[in-house]
Amino acid sequence: MFIKFEKVKKLLNMLQSMLEAGVHFGHQSRRWNPKMAPYIYEEKNGIHILDVVQTIGELEKARTAFKSAKNVIFVGTRPAIAPLIEQVATKTGSNYVNTRWVGGLLTNWTTMTMCLEKLGRLDAQLETATPKKGFTKKDILSLTRERERLEKFFGGLRNLKTLPDLVVIVGQPNERNAVLECQKLNIPTITLLDSNCDPTFVSYGIPANDDSARSVAFILDQLTKD
């Protein structure tokens, strides 16, 4: 009896934390994707409210998948979410994309590998690029600008040596290219599913508000916790 009480208490605490983080808030009902109907609890004042009881169950499935993955990319490029993507990737030793998903990042892996190798070479060059080594100020400036250009799009992927075995996506409607490339290559995805998302394009979908930084931070923390 005590064990059951503790489980119920833990569940209630989790639900309370989700509500405080605004995980349950979807979009205006006119902006929804009808495929999300099974995850909608109700419509209130023109806003869809997500069923956070289902969120808990789906989050647990996603957490299991995340723990078994060895090579993960976190994706989320909207300005409000980008810092969270870098933080969670750094915390978990994962790769990330938080500025722009470059088309062909996964499906054109050969070119992608060349870009990462070039970035690595530029890092090494700039560590020793001094006038004493024969580099002019113009040379150093040119190398620096080239590295900054590659860093902007590929800096979070420096440790990516092979195609990922899992991609975590925040903001599905904005990350369509990432979604389609993962689908084409049969790479599993974990996706936060707001009321305007398409659950048929995910391997593990977590019904949750993906616009609020607080909601996203909460879900990512729960997803990656030990």
From Swiss-Prot:
Transmembrane segments: none annotated. Coiled coil: none annotated. PROSITE patterns: RIBOSOMAL_S2_1, RIBOSOMAL_S2_2. InterPro entries: Ribosomal_uS2, Ribosomal_uS2_bac/mit/plastid, Ribosomal_uS2_CS, Ribosomal_uS2_flav_dom_sf. One of its GO terms (molecular function) is structural constituent of ribosome. Keywords: Chloroplast, Plastid, Ribonucleoprotein, Ribosomal protein. One of its GO terms (cellular component) is chloroplast. It comes from the Eukaryota. Pfam families: Ribosomal_S2. It is found in: Plastid, Chloroplast. GO terms for biological process: translation. PANTHER family: 30S RIBOSOMAL PROTEIN S2 PROKARYOTIC AND ORGANELLAR, SMALL RIBOSOMAL SUBUNIT PROTEIN US2M. Belongs to the universal ribosomal protein uS2 family. This is Small ribosomal subunit protein uS2c. The lineage of its organism: Eukaryota, Viridiplantae, Chlorophyta, Mamiellophyceae, Mamiellales.
